[in-house]
Amino acid sequence: MRIINRLSFLLITFLLGYSSVYSQTQADVKMGEILNGGDLFQLRNEYPNLRDSVSIKMLNLIADTQLGIGFNKLENAAVALDSLLLHHQNEMDGQTSIGMAALQGMNFLNLGMYEQAGKVGESLVNALKNSVPFEALYSFVFMEKVGNALANVPKPYLERPDLDVAVPMSVETVGRGKHIYIPVEVNGITKNYIFDTGCSFGNFVSEKYAKEAGLKIVADSIPVSGMEIGFVKLATADSMKIGELVYHNPVFMVAPPDNEIDSVFTFDGVLGYNFIRDAREIIIDNEAGKYIFPHKVSDGEPNMYLSSNTPRVRINYDEKPFDLILDTGNVKSDLGNKFAEIFPHAIEGLAEHTTSRGGFGGISQITAVTLPKFCFKAAGTTVTLYDTEVVKKAESSNQLFSGSLGADFVLSFKRLAINYQNMFIRGE
């Protein structure tokens, strides 16, 4: 859903136009620079000191929106978005208004306010369907179709005992890396799901499993993006159980069979964003071979934020901050062309080779180099990963991809806490 991530870029155009009409204070200029820079950690640190000095109220509302979405304070983001779209439409150009509406629609989906999300998606589709290609429209179609199909479905919620809950984990070798699994029971059927922070909405399951588990199909032709844009069905269940945790009203994307992918590996399900977020904190204890869901959530300073429902972790490499996607469903960490551009010395002299990447929509061949040792600071400690591929060219020449921390990153720790309540990871 790349469209909901365009806000930072749209702001640049808006602020340049805005300054020609209104005089700006120093605080306004500084706030605009921070917002356009797109560094949420800088915004979080400097916003409290700037807020009262900013004369353009809309800038504060945009900051509240970005911080609310990025640091998982969805209700705060909802209030700011409502105010922006109700009272500041005339101060925004068309692209910025679209970006704000898209953020609001996705925020509605994440809050379980499906009917409202469907209406926002429908409005965006109707406004744009005759002027933009489907590749620019599909995320709004997703919003419309999912919101409308779930309009009468209660929002999901987690029921749990007042104690720590432990659930066994398992690890299996897949291709060039590993998958980390967690047992999930739906309608009396227990299967191992891939534990995947990179799955950005609901859960992702195979069509075969959906039939076996008796999932209720509520819609089809839902567009999603993987290796390419494809279509899935949408399904629901009354609940799913993970140990002593009961997650009510879960949502599932049901993928059709794919002979190319199925020839490499098969899967039943992928546990995604909504449950992981609502669990608040999950400790992956690799030594004990289990997941721990603590009753009391840990405190900590953020080193992670959400972008399109996917966590991005701030690491430090070569004494510089760098953000990587935390994608526990990726069998092995990889680095992208953004890393190659910022740290060219790291890959200098490394031989290029062909490698493959797979996911929903198929398998593609790409050119990469292999970094023998990737040493960086993250999660409160020093981490070393081995034989990390660096993809020097993205599929789109305009696209900069930073990279992702995959299963090998998770398994490099004795224990790794993933905390969505306070937006941090911490390892030992």
What are these regions (language model features)?
Residues 1-28:
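Bacterial Sec-dependent N-terminal signal peptides
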Residues 23-428:
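Pepsin/retropepsin-fold aspartyl endopeptidases
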